[in-house]
């Protein structure tokens, strides 16, 4: 198997297959669940809005997808600085049955010089998750832009108890970049290599996935990237990876997240 095919195979096993669109429906989420069981193996998770968790759980149970995790989003997508609302949303997501919660860090507050609210919001949301629900923190690196701010948001999130740090919501102009990945995984290597990393949005094909996995291997070791420590947040990426593995036709037309 070529290096590119190996990267494609690995990336599928690390994928949070995502639909976070305003026009999402039960039927679209059911279809997403079926897509997550790919000819090359299951994706690590699906990522959906909280209201679709019950239908996703039912569908995954029916199709033998019990091992596919259900991730959802809170404080999404704007990263507001109201801790109480973020906590209520996170508690509700856990009550709905989310295995993982991707919460948006109050990145605008950090850009205005407020480091405290981000730390406290992540800490409170981690407490709301309890012991069994994974918390991923979206720092919106494409808006932070400044390497010092990307580093600071990563440090604050890890210090507050994040299980993963994630680049992006996929709802802004600049999403996952190798530059942000380098900074964020450097912080992970310095602080706690058990914390995971999730590039989201903009990873379009096996070659791009391989580049992100290469940064992970260089900074954290060849065997570091597993579903417990690395995820790709993506939608269109899956079809491209299956095409690389010669298990699907080339994608047609416009592609999303």
Curated annotation (Swiss-Prot):
It comes from the Bacteria. The keyword Lyase applies. GO terms for molecular function: deoxyribose-phosphate aldolase activity. Its EC number is 4.1.2.4. The keyword Lyase applies. Its main location: cytoplasm. It is found in: Cytoplasm. GO terms for biological process: 2-deoxyribose 1-phosphate catabolic process; carbohydrate catabolic process; deoxyribonucleotide catabolic process. Pfam families: DeoC (PF01791). GO terms for cellular component: cytoplasm. Keywords: Cytoplasm, Lyase, Schiff base. InterPro entries: Aldolase_TIM, DeoC, DeoC/FbaB/LacD_aldolase, DeoC_typeII. The active site is at 102 (proton donor/acceptor), 166 (schiff-base intermediate with acetaldehyde), 198 (proton donor/acceptor). Pathway: Carbohydrate degradation; 2-deoxy-D-ribose 1-phosphate degradation; D-glyceraldehyde 3-phosphate and acetaldehyde from 2-deoxy-alpha-D-ribose 1-phosphate: step 2/2. Catalyzes a reversible aldol reaction between acetaldehyde and D-glyceraldehyde 3-phosphate to generate 2-deoxy-D-ribose 5-phosphate. NCBIfam families: deoC. This is Deoxyribose-phosphate aldolase. The lineage of its organism: Bacteria, Pseudomonadati, Pseudomonadota, Gammaproteobacteria, Alteromonadales. The gene is deoC.
């Amino acid at each position: 198997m070529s290096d590119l095919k190996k990267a494609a195979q690995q990336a599928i096993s690390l994928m949070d297959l995502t639909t976070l669109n305003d026009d999402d429906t039960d039927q679209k989420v059911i279809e997403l669940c079926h897509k997550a069981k790919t000819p090359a193996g299951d994706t690590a998770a699906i990522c959906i809005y909280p209201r679709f968790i019950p239908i996703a759980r039912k569908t995954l149970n029916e199709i033998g997808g019990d091992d596919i995790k259900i991730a959802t989003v809170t404080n999404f997508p704007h990263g507001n600085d109201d801790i109480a609302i973020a906590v209520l949303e996170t508690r509700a997501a856990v009550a709905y049955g989310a295995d993982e919660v991707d919460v948006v860090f109050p990145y605008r507050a950090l850009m205005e010089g407020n480091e405290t609210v981000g730390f406290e919001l992540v800490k409170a949301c981690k407490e709301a998750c309890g012991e069994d629900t994974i918390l991923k923190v979206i720092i919106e690196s494409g808006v932070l832009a400044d390497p010092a701010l990307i580093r600071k948001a990563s440090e604050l999130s890890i210090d507050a108890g994040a299980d993963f740090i994630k680049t992006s919501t996929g709802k802004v102009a600049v999403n996952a970049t190798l530059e942000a990945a380098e900074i964020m995984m450097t912080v992970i290597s310095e602080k706690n290599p058990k914390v995971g990393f999730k590039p989201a949005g903009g990873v379009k094909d096996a070659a791009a996935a391989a580049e992100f996995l290469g940064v992970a291997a260089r900074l954290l070791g060849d065997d570091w990237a597993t579903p417990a420590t690395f995820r790709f947040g993506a939608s269109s990426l899956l079809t491209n990876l299956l095409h690389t593995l010669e298990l699907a036709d080339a994608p047609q037309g416009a592609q999303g997240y």
